[in-house]
C-alpha cells in the first residue's frame, strides 16, 4: 500500500506519516514548502511538490499512490472568495484522486458539521463530505473531536507557567472525548489497510470524555500548582463577534468566535460508546489515557526545569 498524505505537517498528519513509515509503507507527502517539511524527509518520506491553489500541480503527485490521506485544513482568508476558493481546492484534490484511480480516499471532517454551516470552514467540510460520498471512490471519513496534543498549549503550558487559563461561560457543560494523535494515527492506518472497511465514517475518540474544569484540575494536580482561571462571559463573546463581523480584516476571527459560541452551547460532544463497531472497540482498550499523557508531559517539563536550575 503506497500512501500520499496531504497536510502531513499537521498534528495528526505527522503522526500518520511517522507510524506508516515504521510499518513499512511507502509514503509520499504533498508539500508546498519543502523546508518546513524537511523533518518528514529525514524520517524517510518522499516529498512531492503540490499546491492546492494550483490544481495543475496535483495530478503528478497522485501517480503511484493507492491511498490518499487528506489531513489538510481549510484556511479562510478572503472575505469575498473564502468559500469558493477553498471548496475549489478540496474538489481539485478529489478530481485528481478520481483521475489517478486511487483505491481509497481517507478524509477528516468535523463531528456534526451540518450544525455549524454558518462557519465557512465547517461548511466546506460538510460539502466536501457529500462530494466524496458521491464520487464513487472507496472512502473513509474520520471525525475527531480533539487531540491531547492541542490541550498542552491551551491548558498545560499556561498552568506550568502560572499564567491564567481562559474558559468560556457555561463551557464546563461541554464533554469532549479527546484522543492522543498517535493513537488516532494507528486507528487510521489500521482501518485504511483493511479492504472491507470502506464507504463509512469513523469517530476518532478517546475512552473518556472531559470538560475544561476537569482538565484544568488534572493539569494542576500534576503541575503541583494552581493558576487563575478566567471565565469569559458568552455575552461578551457575542458582542465581540458582532463587532468583528463588520470588518473584512477581522472576519476570520469572527467565524472562529461563531464556532466557539456554538460549541459552548453543545451539551455533549462525544459518541455513544455502545454503538461503536467492533473494530473501534478493539482499539478503545489500547488507547493512551489523558492522565498518563499529562503525567508524562509535566514530569518531563519539570524534570528539564530542575536540570536547568541545577546547572545554573
UniProtKB/Swiss-Prot annotation:
Its main location: plastid. Keywords: Chloroplast, Oxidoreductase, Photosynthesis, Photosystem II, Plastid. Its EC number is 1.-.-.-. Signal peptide: none annotated. It is found in: Plastid, Chloroplast. One of its GO terms (cellular component) is chloroplast. One of its GO terms (molecular function) is oxidoreductase activity. Involved in assembly of photosystem II. Belongs to the NmrA-type oxidoreductase family. Ycf39 subfamily. This is Photosystem II assembly factor Ycf39. It comes from Cyanidium caldarium (Red alga).
Amino acid at each position: 500500500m503506497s500512501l500520499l498524505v496531504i497536510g502531513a505537517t499537521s498534528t495528526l498528519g505527522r503522526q500518520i506519516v511517522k507510524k506508516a513509515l515504521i510499518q513499512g509503507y511507502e509514503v509520499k507527502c504533498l508539500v508546498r514548502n519543502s523546508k518546513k517539511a524537511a523533518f518528514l524527509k529525514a524520517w524517510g518520506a518522499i516529498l512531492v511538490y503540490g499546491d492546492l491553489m494550483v490544481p495543475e500541480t496535483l495530478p503528478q503527485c497522485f501517480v503511484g499512490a493507492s491511498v490518499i490521506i487528506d489531513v489538510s485544513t481549510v484556511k479562510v482568508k478572503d472575505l469575498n472568495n473564502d468559500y469558493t476558493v477553498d471548496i475549489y481546492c478540496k474538489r481539485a484534490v478529489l478530481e485528481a484522486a478520481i483521475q489517478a484511480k486511487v483505491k481509497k480516499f481517507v478524509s477528516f471532517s468535523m463531528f456534526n458539521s451540518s450544525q455549524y454551516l454558518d462557519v465557512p470552514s465547517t461548511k466546506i467540510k460538510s460539502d466536501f463530505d457529500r462530494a466524496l460520498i458521491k464520487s464513487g471512490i472507496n472512502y473513509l471519513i474520520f471525525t475527531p473531536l480533539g487531540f491531547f496534543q492541542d490541550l498542552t498549549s491551551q491548558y498545560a503550558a499556561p498552568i506550568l507557567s502560572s499564567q491564567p487559563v481562559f474558559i468560556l461561560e457555561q463551557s464546563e457543560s461541554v464533554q469532549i472525548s479527546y484522543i492522543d494523535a498517535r493513537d488516532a494515527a494507528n486507528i487510521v492506518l489500521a482501518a485504511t489497510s483493511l479492504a472491507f472497511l470502506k464507504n463509512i465514517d469513523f469517530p476518532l475518540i478517546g475512552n473518556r470524555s472531559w470538560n475544561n474544569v476537569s482538565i484544568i484540575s488534572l493539569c494542576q494536580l500534576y503541575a503541583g500548582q494552581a493558576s487563575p482561571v478566567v471565565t469569559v462571559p458568552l455575552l461578551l463573546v457575542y458582542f465581540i463577534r458582532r463587532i468583528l463581523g463588520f470588518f473584512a480584516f477581522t472576519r476570520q476571527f469572527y467565524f472562529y468566535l461563531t464556532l466557539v459560541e456554538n460549541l459552548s452551547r453543545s451539551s455533549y460532544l462525544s459518541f455513544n460508546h455502545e454503538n461503536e463497531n467492533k473494530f473501534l472497540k478493539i482499539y478503545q482498550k489500547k488507547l493512551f489515557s489523558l492522565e498518563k499523557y499529562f503525567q508524562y508531559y509535566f514530569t518531563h517539563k519539570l524534570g528539564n526545569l530542575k536540570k536547568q536550575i541545577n546547572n545554573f
